C-alpha cells in the first residue's frame, strides 16, 4: 500500500494531526466552535490590517488624514477599514463566549491550556488598545493619555515608566510611532501563542459537555467538526458583514471623527465597548492605585479559577446552583459594561461599585462555596 503523504510528510502530518485525523469527542456542542472562529478572526484581522498598513502613515500630522484617504481614495479602502474595526469587536465577542464556555464546562482544569488562553486574552487587549490609538482621533488620543497615565500609579517608578512609554512628556509623535510598531507586531505574537495554546490542548484532547472522559468515543475532526465549524463560521460572518456594510460606525465613538486635539478634552472619555467592564471596575475605586490594581485583577482573576474549583463534577451541566451563579456573573458583566459607558455621577457610581464588588465576590467566594455545598447535597 502506497504511503499517504498526509501522514508521512513532516509538515503535512502536523496539519493532519491537528485538523484532519485529530480524535475529537463525539458529543461537543456548538460552544466548541469558538476556537476555530477566533483563528478565523485572527487571520481576517492580520490580512485587513496588512492592507491598511500599506496606506497608513504613523505620524501625528498625517495619521488622521491617511485613514481618511484610505476610506475615500483607496479601492475598497472603506470596506477594509470597516472590516478591520468591526472585526476587532467580533474577535472580542468570540473570545468572551470562548472564555464563558471554558468557565461553564470546567475547561480551565487543563491548566496549561487555560493559562496560555489568559495570556492570549491579555495580548489581544493590548493589541486592541494600541490599535485604537492609530487613527489619531479625539478618543484615540485621550484614551491613550488616560490609560497610559494609569502606570504612573505604580509607586516609585510610575512617572518614569509613563514618560518612557510615551517617549516624551505627553502622548505625541513618538507614542504614535511605537504604538503602530506594537500593533503590527502583536498579532503575530498572538498567532505564535495560539500554536502553543493548541499544542497544550492536543496533549489532553478536548473537554466535553458532560465533563467525563471521551476516550471511549472519539471521532475524526474531519469531516464531522470541519463542516460544523464552517456552519459556525457562516453564522458569525452574517452578522459581521451585516454590521460592517449597513452600520459600520455603530460601535465606534463619534468623538473619533474629530482629529486629536491636546487642548480640548472630550466630555466623556471611554474605551471601546469590549473594555467597558474593566473600565467600570477601574472607576469604581476612588483611589488611583487601587483602581489600577482592581483593573488588573479583573482579568488576572481568570488565572485563579482552576484553584477555586471545589466541585467533584467538572462541568456545570448537572449543577443548577452553579449555573444560576454563572448566569448571575454574566448579567453582572453586562451591568458593568453599561456602567462603563455612563458618566461618573449618581446613581451610576454606586451601581458600578456594587457590580464590581459582586463580580469579585461571585468568582472568589460564591463559586467555591456553592461547589462545596453541591458536593454536600449530593452526599459526596
From Swiss-Prot:
Q: What SUPFAM superfamilies does the database record attribute to this sequence?
A: a domain/subunit of cytochrome bc1 complex (Ubiquinol-cytochrome c reductase), Transmembrane di-heme cytochromes
Residue ranges spanning the membrane: these are 34-54, 78-99, 114-134, 179-199, 227-247, 289-309, 321-341, 348-368
Residues in a coiled coil are none
Keyword check for Heme? yes
Residues that hold a ubiquinone according to the record: 202
Q: What note does UniProt attach to the cofactor annotation?
A: Binds 2 heme b groups non-covalently.
Keywords assigned = Electron transport, Heme, Iron, Membrane, Metal-binding, Mitochondrion, Mitochondrion inner membrane, Respiratory chain, Transmembrane, Transmembrane helix, Transport, Ubiquinone
Which terms does the UniProt entry file under GO BP? mitochondrial electron transport, ubiquinol to cytochrome c
Q: What does the entry list as the binding residues for heme b b566? A: 98, 197
Cofactor(s) needed, names only, are:
heme b
GO molecular function, one example? metal ion binding
The entry's heme b b562-binding residues are: 84, 183
Q: How does it assemble?
A: The cytochrome bc1 complex contains 11 subunits: 3 respiratory subunits (MT-CYB, CYC1 and UQCRFS1), 2 core proteins (UQCRC1 and UQCRC2) and 6 low-molecular weight proteins (UQCRH/QCR6, UQCRB/QCR7, UQCRQ/QCR8, UQCR10/QCR9, UQCR11/QCR10 and a cleavage product of UQCRFS1). This cytochrome bc1 complex then forms a dimer.
Q: What else is known?
A: Heme 1 (or BL or b562) is low-potential and absorbs at about 562 nm, and heme 2 (or BH or b566) is high-potential and absorbs at about 566 nm.
> What family is reported?
Belongs to the cytochrome b family.
Per the entry, what this protein does is:
Component of the ubiquinol-cytochrome c reductase complex (complex III or cytochrome b-c1 complex) that is part of the mitochondrial respiratory chain. The b-c1 complex mediates electron transfer from ubiquinol to cytochrome c. Contributes to the generation of a proton gradient across the mitochondrial membrane that is then used for ATP synthesis.
* The protein's name: Cytochrome b
Annotated organism of origin? Alectoris graeca
Q: Cite the source lineage.
A: Eukaryota, Metazoa, Chordata, Craniata, Vertebrata
Amino acid at each position: 500500500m502506497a504511503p499517504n503523504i498526509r501522514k508521512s510528510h513532516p509538515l503535512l502530518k502536523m496539519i493532519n494531526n491537528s485538523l484532519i485525523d485529530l480524535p475529537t469527542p463525539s458529543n461537543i456542542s456548538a460552544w466548541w466552535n469558538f476556537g476555530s472562529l477566533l483563528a478565523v478572526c485572527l487571520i481576517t484581522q492580520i490580512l485587513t490590517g496588512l492592507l491598511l498598513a500599506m496606506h497608513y502613515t504613523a505620524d501625528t500630522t498625517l495619521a488622521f488624514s491617511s485613514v481618511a484617504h484610505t476610506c475615500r481614495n483607496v479601492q475598497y479602502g472603506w470596506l477594509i477599514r470597516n472590516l478591520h474595526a468591526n472585526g476587532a469587536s467580533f474577535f472580542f465577542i468570540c473570545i468572551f463566549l470562548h472564555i464563558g464556555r471554558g468557565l461553564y464546562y470546567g475547561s480551565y482544569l487543563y491548566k496549561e491550556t487555560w493559562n496560555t488562553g489568559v495570556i492570549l486574552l491579555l495580548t489581544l487587549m493590548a493589541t486592541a488598545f494600541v490599535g485604537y490609538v492609530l487613527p489619531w482621533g479625539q478618543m484615540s488620543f485621550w484614551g491613550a493619555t488616560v490609560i497610559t497615565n494609569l502606570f504612573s500609579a505604580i509607586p516609585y517608578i510610575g512617572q518614569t515608566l509613563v514618560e518612557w512609554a510615551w517617549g516624551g512628556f505627553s502622548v505625541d509623535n513618538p507614542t504614535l510611532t511605537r504604538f503602530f510598531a506594537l500593533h503590527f507586531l502583536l498579532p503575530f505574537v498572538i498567532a505564535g501563542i495560539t500554536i502553543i495554546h493548541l499544542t497544550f490542548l492536543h496533549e489532553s484532547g478536548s473537554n466535553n459537555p458532560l465533563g467525563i472522559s471521551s476516550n471511549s468515543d472519539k471521532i475524526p475532526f474531519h469531516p464531522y467538526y470541519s463542516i460544523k465549524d464552517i456552519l459556525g463560521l457562516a453564522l458569525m460572518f452574517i452578522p459581521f458583514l451585516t454590521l460592517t456594510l449597513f452600520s459600520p460606525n455603530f460601535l465606534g465613538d463619534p468623538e473619533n471623527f474629530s482629529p486629536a486635539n491636546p487642548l480640548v478634552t472630550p466630555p466623556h472619555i471611554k474605551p471601546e465597548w469590549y473594555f467597558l467592564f474593566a473600565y467600570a471596575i477601574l472607576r469604581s475605586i476612588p483611589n488611583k492605585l487601587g483602581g489600577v490594581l482592581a483593573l488588573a485583577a479583573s482579568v488576572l482573576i481568570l488565572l485563579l479559577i482552576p484553584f477555586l474549583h471545589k466541585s467533584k463534577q467538572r462541568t456545570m451541566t448537572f449543577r443548577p446552583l452553579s449555573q444560576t451563579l454563572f448566569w448571575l456573573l454574566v448579567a453582572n458583566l453586562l451591568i458593568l459594561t453599561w456602567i462603563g459607558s455612563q458618566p461618573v455621577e449618581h446613581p451610576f457610581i454606586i451601581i458600578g461599585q456594587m457590580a464590581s464588588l459582586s463580580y469579585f465576590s461571585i468568582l472568589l467566594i460564591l463559586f467555591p462555596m456553592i461547589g462545596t455545598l453541591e458536593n454536600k447535597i449530593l452526599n459526596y
